[in-house]
Amino acid sequence: MRMRKKPWARPELESCNFFIVNPKENKGKWNESFNNENPIYLELGCGKGVFVAVHGSDNENINYIAIDIKDEVLGLAKRNIEKAYNEKNKELNNIKLMAQEIGLINEILDENDKISRIYINFCNPWPKKKHKKRRLTHTRQLIQYRNFLKENGEIWFKTDDDELFEESLEYFKEGKFRIEYITYDLHTSGFEGNIQTEHERMFTEQGIKTKFLIAIKED
């Protein structure tokens, strides 16, 4: 379902001190933007921000870059992030929110940024053959991620889509990533530390199992 236009979103984002209007300016120097040397985690397709809001407010010693493309969804993410921090009485200084085409992620990140972990949660499965190269786990995307992932950097990938998950296993192999952990039913796996996204809650209520893996960058 297409999200309705939200005229308030762009002005509210531009007045937000953790929204980055021109992320290309920080390429290669994101630690400087955070003003510390803490590890950086990257969420690709942050949606309404529920996931990064919980993660960031619970882990003040980790920096988070959260990316999506539409102002409408980023505006909601901004509000959800602020709400999570306010409820926990936490200072919001470890999240940077921005609009960026993920297919061009190397415009804003490079090897100097040394990203420790990437989260890909319930991305578009692009089931048609001619569209599969758009998948966030496709080999050509993984090659981009390798440029800025640190040595032994991780990708945490969750999806409800069986075909996407199975084909992504081959993508990771082609992209020289080792599968460190895999489950076809995350919620009965005993894996600790999972934070549910809004999509994950919806699919779980429908009885759809969440597939999950952790892939490690290899030399």
Curated annotation (Swiss-Prot):
Keywords: Methyltransferase, S-adenosyl-L-methionine, Transferase, tRNA processing
Record field: catalytic activity: guanosine(46) in tRNA + S-adenosyl-L-methionine = N(7)-methylguanosine(46) in tRNA + S-adenosyl-L-homocysteine
Enzyme class (EC, first level): transferase
Database matches in PROSITE patterns: SAM_MT_TRMB
InterPro entries: SAM-dependent_MTases_sf (IPR029063), tRNA_(Gua-N-7)_MeTrfase_Trmb (IPR003358), tRNA_methyltr_TrmB_bact (IPR055361)
The keyword Methyltransferase is assigned to this record: yes
Residues the entry annotates as binding S-adenosyl-L-methionine: 43, 68, 101, 124
GO cellular component entries: tRNA methyltransferase complex
Keyword Transferase: yes
EC number, as in UniProt: 2.1.1.33
A GO molecular function held by the record: tRNA (guanine(46)-N7)-methyltransferase activity
Pathway: tRNA modification; N(7)-methylguanine-tRNA biosynthesis
Protein residues bound to substrate: 128, 160
Annotated function: Catalyzes the formation of N(7)-methylguanine at position 46 (m7G46) in tRNA.
NCBIfam families attached to this UniProt entry: PRK00121.2-2 (NF001080), tRNA (guanosine(46)-N7)-methyltransferase TrmB (TIGR00091)
Family: Belongs to the class I-like SAM-binding methyltransferase superfamily. TrmB family.
Name the record gives this protein: tRNA (guanine-N(7)-)-methyltransferase
Species annotation: Clostridium botulinum (strain Eklund 17B / Type B)
Gene assigned in the entry: trmB
